[in-house]
């Protein structure tokens, strides 16, 4: 590898399905940067060795995906965001020190800012699900100043665990209490896999949501979930999962290649075409 060419990679197992190379190669071309982005299929038993010798493998940083996100936290110097979410998805060097962060938070908030400017005028949000993605969403909303987050999960204990982690602005509610929480929610976010291709649908009557509410779905296959379609039918603004995927990639690129890229309509169209059934 030429000394002038900087390269990053995606470490996962499996990882071949990822659109990250498409996204980063687009930005490299747009910005005229001599660089590369590869996929490294690394099994769990080889992950620690690979990460601890990332420079030796020719990389200035990496994205991390399933099943390595929690292990990456332990092998690096994590920031506040990675610790809060309990997982790292982006690795980068600070001198010889390998640091980690979680860019899902910036991806979620950046997508909302781009798709529904002014979404944060509402002080109340309703978040569905209490998994890893929910932690990133809750952290981002609290950081942005949302005063009350109703958190619905089928297992109320998992929602209570997030309240214990993030404080009393997070209010756990039973899944059956979602209808009662809708009238006061200026933002509704689905962080579950419900509505994803091959998964059960997410069935919620949105008629009680305020007329100026925003609906966000982290699912991006299909691009327009039933939840988003129902929101659009009511005239509500929406933010889809593909937008979050694109925006979460921005900071990693900046850390590795020293230039902050932009999420453009052209990039979105490129990834949409790649996601389309062949």
From Swiss-Prot:
Chemical reaction(s) catalysed: shikimate + NADP(+) = 3-dehydroshikimate + NADPH + H(+)
Upper classification of the organism: Bacteria, Pseudomonadati, Pseudomonadota, Alphaproteobacteria, Hyphomicrobiales
Active site: 69
Superkingdom per UniProt: Bacteria
EC number per UniProt: 1.1.1.25
GO CC, any one term: cytosol
GO biological process, one term: aromatic amino acid family biosynthetic process
GO molecular function: NADP binding; shikimate 3-dehydrogenase (NADP+) activity
Keywords: Amino-acid biosynthesis, Aromatic amino acid biosynthesis, NADP, Oxidoreductase
NCBIfam families found in the cross-reference section: aroE, PRK00258.1-4
Pfam families (UniProt xref): SDH_C (PF18317), Shikimate_DH (PF01488), Shikimate_dh_N (PF08501)
Quaternary organization: Homodimer.
Positions of shikimate binding: 18-20, 65, 89, 104, 220
Protein family according to the UniProt entry: Belongs to the shikimate dehydrogenase family.
Organism from which the protein derives: Rhodopseudomonas palustris (strain ATCC BAA-98 / CGA009)
The protein's role, per its UniProt record: Involved in the biosynthesis of the chorismate, which leads to the biosynthesis of aromatic amino acids. Catalyzes the reversible NADPH linked reduction of 3-dehydroshikimate (DHSA) to yield shikimate (SA).
Entry protein name: Shikimate dehydrogenase (NADP(+))
Disulfide bond entries: none
Annotated HAMAP family: Shikimate_DH_AroE
Binding site for NADP(+): 80, 129-133, 218, 241
Pathway recorded for this protein: Metabolic intermediate biosynthesis; chorismate biosynthesis; chorismate from D-erythrose 4-phosphate and phosphoenolpyruvate: step 4/7
């Amino acid at each position: 590898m030429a000394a002038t060419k900087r390269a990053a990679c995606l470490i996962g197992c499996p990882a071949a399905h990822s659109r990250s190379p498409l996204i980063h190669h687009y930005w490299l071309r747009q910005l005229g940067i001599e660089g590369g982005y590869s996929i490294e299929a690394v099994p769990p038993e080889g992950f620690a060795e690979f990460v601890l010798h990332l420079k030796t493998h020719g990389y200035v940083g990496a994205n991390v995906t399933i099943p390595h996100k929690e292990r990456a936290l332990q092998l690096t110097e994590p920031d506040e965001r990675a610790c809060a979410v309990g997982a790292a998805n982006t690795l980068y060097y600070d001198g010889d020190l390998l640091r980690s962060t979680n860019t899902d938070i910036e991806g979620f908030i950046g997508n909302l800012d781009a798709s529904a400017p002014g979404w944060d005028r509402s002080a109340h949000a309703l978040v569905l699900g209490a998994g890893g993605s929910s932690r990133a969403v809750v952290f981002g909303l609290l950081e942005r100043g949302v005063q009350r987050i109703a958190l619905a999960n089928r297992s109320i204990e998992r929602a209570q665990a997030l309240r214990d982690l993030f404080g009393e602005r997070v209010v756990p509610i039973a899944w059956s209490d979602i209808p009662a929480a809708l009238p006061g929610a200026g933002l509704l976010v689905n962080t579950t896999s419900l509505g994803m291709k091959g998964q059960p649908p997410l069935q919620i009557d949105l008629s009680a949501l305020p007329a100026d509410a925003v609906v966000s779905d982290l699912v991006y296959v299909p691009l327009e979930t039933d939840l988003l379609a129902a929101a659009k039918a009511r005239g509500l603004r929406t933010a889809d999962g593909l937008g979050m995927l694109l925006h979460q990639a921005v900071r990693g690129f900046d850390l590795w290649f020293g230039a902050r890229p932009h999420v453009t309509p052209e990039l979105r169209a490129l990834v949409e075409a790649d996601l389309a059934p062949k």
